[in-house]
Curated annotation (Swiss-Prot):
<feature type="binding site">
    <location>
        <position position="62"/>
    </location>
    <ligand>
        <name>[4Fe-4S] cluster</name>
    </ligand>
</feature>
<dbReference type="GO" id="GO:0045271">
    <property type="term" value="C:respiratory chain complex I"/>
</dbReference>
<keyword id="KW-0472">Membrane</keyword>
<keyword id="KW-0997">Cell inner membrane</keyword>
<keyword id="KW-0874">Quinone</keyword>
<dbReference type="InterPro" id="IPR006137">
    <property type="entry name" value="NADH_UbQ_OxRdtase-like_20kDa"/>
</dbReference>
<dbReference type="GO" id="GO:0008137">
    <property type="term" value="F:NADH dehydrogenase (ubiquinone) activity"/>
</dbReference>
<dbReference type="GO" id="GO:0050136">
    <property type="term" value="F:NADH:ubiquinone reductase (non-electrogenic) activity"/>
</dbReference>
<protein>
    <recommendedName>
        <fullName>NADH-quinone oxidoreductase subunit B 2</fullName>
        <ecNumber>7.1.1.-</ecNumber>
    </recommendedName>
</protein>
<dbReference type="GO" id="GO:0009060">
    <property type="term" value="P:aerobic respiration"/>
</dbReference>
<feature type="binding site">
    <location>
        <position position="128"/>
    </location>
    <ligand>
        <name>[4Fe-4S] cluster</name>
    </ligand>
</feature>
<comment type="similarity">
    <text>Belongs to the complex I 20 kDa subunit family.</text>
</comment>
<keyword id="KW-0830">Ubiquinone</keyword>
<keyword id="KW-0408">Iron</keyword>
<keyword id="KW-0479">Metal-binding</keyword>
<dbReference type="GO" id="GO:0048038">
    <property type="term" value="F:quinone binding"/>
</dbReference>
<dbReference type="GO" id="GO:0051539">
    <property type="term" value="F:4 iron, 4 sulfur cluster binding"/>
</dbReference>
Amino acid sequence: MESPLTPSAQPAPMPSLVAATGPSTPEIPPEVSQIARFAKLDDLLALGRANSLWPLTFGLACCAIEMMAAGMARFDISRFGAEVFRPSPRQADVMIVAGTVNKKMAPAVKLLYDQMLEPKWVIAMGQCAISGGPFKYPGQYAVVEGVDQLFPVDVYVPGCPPRPEALIEGILKLEEKITGKRRFPVAQLKE
């Protein structure tokens, strides 16, 4: 009985996926690169994390109203990967601190940050969260002058209060920080 694979129909031997320089630099055969895409696992994880941010809202003052407006239909923050505001720190990976943090509330804010799972990021929204805002004056005793004194902040969104568009820009900056590239490039202005 003749083999179903004649000598001309037998597949060519698969070329080695290991380059001559060593196992750390694989060489992809051209016939494979035409039908498949390759990426580093870290890059794929970063892309997934950046496009599915789960924000924990911590609205403390007037900035919280603008943060809520960003989640409504007019601005629709879910188009940018921050789908649903989470009520629990164990379900969130981005903490948006919007408003004034006083020293009595600081331990609770720090505890919420500590309860978030890794990887976790923080967006400081508004001048009060960034630097104490109008409550920062000589001799004040009650206001934390910036949440970066409690934990690291990844993105600062300035304004008093910042508009929902500014928060969306902050989320895009955070995505850029996670993946290393911008999803919606900003047009460069000619001088």
